[in-house]
Regions:
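Alpha-helical segment of the N-proximal tetratricopeptide repeat
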Residues: 28-53
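Start-of-helix register in tetratricopeptide repeats
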Residues: 33, 67, 101-103, 137
């Protein structure tokens, strides 16, 4: 990690940061990669609240950065904030366009499924499988989604 960035992260982690504005002010000179690495480091240091604040600061400064959209989407998923994860991963798909990766589609489908919108999850995976028909990860995700959909349909207590 960039030494100056690491020092800033350590200072932020040691201090009681009062809000997003304080974080943005402290890190406004850093790159999207610095933000991604910083969020990873803060999560590894068991500081999820500051990691979230840093991700939000990164998004406010670089809203179209793949690095920040990826880490922010993953962070939202770990927090089980499915609507935010969906929004961030959809933004990532829009930014990547034809460069979108199978894992991005897998994570987006999973976020939709966890948000209990199985139709959207199937739509994402079906679209991805048209691009990568032999991708084992996507095939496995689709099979898991089919089983989950069947289990949900069979259970009267869902929804």
């Amino acid at each position: 990690m960039h030494i100056e960035f690491q020092k800033t992260m350590q200072q932020l982690a040691a201090a009681q940061v009062s809000g997003l504005g304080d974080v943005v002010k402290e890190v406004s000179d850093f790159t999207p990669i610095d933000f991604r690495v910083g969020v990873q480091w803060l999560v590894a240091q068991n500081n999820p609240h500051l990691a979230q604040a840093l991700a939000e600061a990164g998004l406010s400064l670089y809203p179209d950065s793949e690095d920040i959209l990826v880490i922010s989407g993953l962070l939202a998923m770990t927090r089980e904030d499915w609507p935010l994860a969906i929004e961030l991963l959809q933004d990532l798909v829009k930014v990547q366009k034809e460069r979108v990766q199978p894992m991005t589609c897998q994570m987006l489908a999973r976020a939709w499924a966890c948000n209990l919108d199985m139709d959207q999850a199937h739509t994402v995976l079906d679209s991805a499988l048209k691009i990568w028909p032999d991708n084992e990860t996507l095939i496995q995700e689709k099979n898991t989604l089919i089983l989950s959909s069947l289990a949900m349909a069979a259970s009267p207590e869902t929804h």
